[in-house]
Design a protein with these regions (language model features):
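Hydrophobic transmembrane-helix microenvironments that flank and shape a buried ionizable site
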Residues: 1-3, 63, 119
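Select subsegments of transmembrane alpha-helices in polytopic membrane proteins
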Residues: 59-67
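Short, flexible loop/turn segments with low-complexity composition
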Residues: 62, 140-141
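Intrinsically disordered, low-complexity N-terminal regions enriched in serine/proline/glycine
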Residues: 43-46, 62, 92, 110
Length: 141
């Protein structure tokens, strides 16, 4: 529930240093379905908004990119119905997804999965961030 972001903020605020050590070995278990991935990223977005409300110094453009991408993509699709040139931002986003998938994938299967995974991560995170209610607070409070 965004504990890592909040801990990093509190460490830095108190003069601590947060860094990555490449010698660390971690085990990551990816979600088994796109739906489970969407749920995970929706929750990430919701809780990131909670941290940004409590600690305004933790928010930056990188964290605002998914909500802006979601809103921009959606508006582009709606506006494009009335003026086709306005489909352009959505088309550019999709082009970036295709190019990123080509660059990252090591097989056709991975490429096809990435075409679904990348927008799922962006849009679910953005939707969670946008829809996060002000009443959402960590359980300990």
């Amino acid at each position: 529930r965004a504990q890592d972001w909040e801990l990093n903020f509190r460490l830095r605020e108190n003069g601590g240093l947060v860094y990555f050590d490449p010698r660390l070995h971690v085990t990551y278990r990816p979600r088994s379905t796109v739906r489970a991935l969407a749920k995970q990223y929706f929750e990430y977005g919701r809780w990131r908004r909670v941290v940004s409300r409590r600690h305004s110094g933790t928010i930056n453009y990188r964290y605002l990119a998914p909500p802006f991408a979601l809103v921009g993509f959606s508006l582009s699709l709606i506006a494009g119905i009335f003026l086709p040139i306005l489909f352009t931002p959505a088309a550019i986003y999709l082009l970036f997804v295709v190019l990123a998938s080509i660059k990252i994938a090591t097989s056709i299967r991975e490429y096809l999965l990435l075409l679904a995974v990348i927008p799922t991560m962006h849009f679910a995170w953005g939707a969670g961030f946008i829809s996060s209610p002000k009443t959402l607070v960590p359980a300990a409070e």
